Design a protein with these regions (language model features):
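Basic nucleic-acid-binding interfaces
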Residues: 1-29, 34-67
Length: 67
């Protein structure tokens, strides 16, 4: 999955549940950026594999079916 698609779906999920969402592409090198959801943050790369998506959601404290 491409990062843009993942972030779009994650932003939609957060908005529907009233969670704060932010993405900052400046926090990271190359194709990496920082996504923050309700005070929890993690680094996201450009190309995401299914296992990496599950890890990101776990780090953000979100359920596996969030996106």
């Amino acid at each position: 999955m491409q990062r843009d698609v993942f972030l779009r779906n994650l932003k939609r999920y957060c908005k529907a549940r009233g969670l704060a969402f932010d993405f900052d592409p400046r926090h990271g090198k190359g194709g990496h950026g920082r996504v923050t959801v309700d005070g929890k943050f993690t680094t996201v790369q450009t190309e995401l594999k299914p296992l990496h998506i599950q890890t990101i959601l776990k780090q953000l404290g979100l359920p596996k079916d969030a996106v």
